[in-house]
């Protein structure tokens, strides 16, 4: 049996639309073994127990590339990453599927080939890269090749995810974005993306609140998330370092100083006054990324 653990990811980090992403310590685990025949799923809803399951789709893509044909598969899922909340649940399934398939087939593909294949299936390198490699990454796709670099994050920072009880599909969140942007808005984001990376690198945490600003996606998507601005304002009042939409949303991610012990209980009290229910979850950066049989890929 192959055991694969994949972390949740938070993409964009404010201005770094479709390029920045960070892995956090919330995980999906996949236990996969080859059986004599059939396709058996455990740990997921009945509607996902078929060949359209994203984990199986990713596995088949890997098997086809290698030229391996399993006799049958048993796939058990232990999921801690909420679906359609902007925390990289799709990327976790794709990476978990591809890596487990490669292990079953004898490890025919190297790390670079696995990464390129995962991005081909999932489509978002800003989620796939940190899920695969851990830490924070800056990623691009160049002629179908995935290029990325690790972003050094100074010690002393943690994250807090505010996770609502409602979902928001990536497709719906993409549909509200404009077809084109003003030149000045592009410049606005380029500058703040550079500032974000530099501030995290150098421990200039007081600059993060400026770096979190963005003109490419967050304001458009905020309209789909009830109370987004009131929550953001309250987070700022509680001395957060920065607040941004996690991926396409609806989860709101907050950056905090490591020593901040009061934020979670205080924001929880505020969120309890709102109509929707929100889970408050403090998180740390996952530095390992995908782990196979307790070993880093």
Swiss-Prot record:
Please state what class of enzyme this protein is: transferase
Q: GO:BP terms for this protein?
A: threonine biosynthetic process
Q: What is its EC number?
A: 2.7.1.39
Q: In which pathway does it act?
A: Amino-acid biosynthesis; L-threonine biosynthesis; L-threonine from L-aspartate: step 4/5
Subcellular localization: Cytoplasm
Record key words, sorted: Amino-acid biosynthesis, ATP-binding, Cytoplasm, Kinase, Nucleotide-binding, Threonine biosynthesis, Transferase
Q: Supply one GO molecular-function term.
A: ATP binding
Q: Which residue positions does the secretion signal occupy?
A: none
Task: List, alphabetically, the GO terms of the cellular component aspect.
Answer: cytoplasm
Specify one Pfam family.
GHMP_kinases_C
Residue numbers binding ATP: 82-92
PANTHER family, per the entry: HOMOSERINE KINASE, HOMOSERINE/4-DIPHOSPHOCYTIDYL-2-C-METHYL-D-ERYTHRITOL KINASE
- What is the protein name stated in its UniProt record? Homoserine kinase
Originating species: Clostridium botulinum (strain Hall / ATCC 3502 / NCTC 13319 / Type A)
């Amino acid at each position: 049996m192959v055991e694969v653990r994949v972390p949740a990811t938070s993409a964009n980090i404010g201005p770094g639309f479709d390029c920045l992403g960070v892995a956090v310590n919330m995980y999906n685990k996949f236990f996969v073994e080859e059986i004599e025949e059939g396709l058996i799923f455990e740990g997921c809803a009945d509607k996902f127990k078929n060949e359209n399951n994203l984990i199986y789709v990713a596995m088949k893509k890997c098997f086809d590339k290698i030229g391996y044909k399993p006799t049958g598969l048993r796939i058990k899922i232990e999921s801690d990453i909420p679906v359609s909340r902007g925390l990289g649940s799709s990327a976790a399934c794709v990476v978990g599927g591809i890596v487990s398939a490669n292990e079953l087939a004898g490890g025919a593909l190297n790390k670079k080939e696995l990464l390129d294949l995962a991005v081909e299936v999932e489509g978002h390198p800003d989620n796939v890269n940190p899920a695969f490699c851990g830490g924070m990454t800056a990623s691009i796709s160049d002629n179908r090749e995935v290029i990325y670099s690790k972003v050094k994050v100074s010690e002393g920072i943690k994250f807090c995810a505010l996770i609502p009880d409602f979902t928001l599909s990536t497709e719906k969140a993409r549909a509200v974005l404009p077809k084109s942007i003003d030149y000045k808005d592009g410049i606005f984001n380029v500058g703040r993306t550079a500032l974000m990376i530099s501030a995290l690198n150098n421990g200039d945490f007081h600059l993060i609140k400026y770096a979190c600003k963005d003109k490419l996606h967050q304001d458009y998507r905020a309209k789909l998330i009830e109370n987004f601005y009131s929550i953001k304002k309250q987070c700022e009042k509680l001395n957060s370092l920065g607040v941004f939409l996690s991926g396409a949303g609806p989860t709101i991610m907050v950056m905090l100083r490591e020593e901040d012990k009061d934020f979670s209980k205080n924001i929880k009290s505020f969120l309890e006054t709102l109509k929707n229910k929100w889970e408050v979850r403090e998180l740390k950066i996952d530095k390992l990324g995908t782990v196979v049989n307790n070993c880093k890929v």
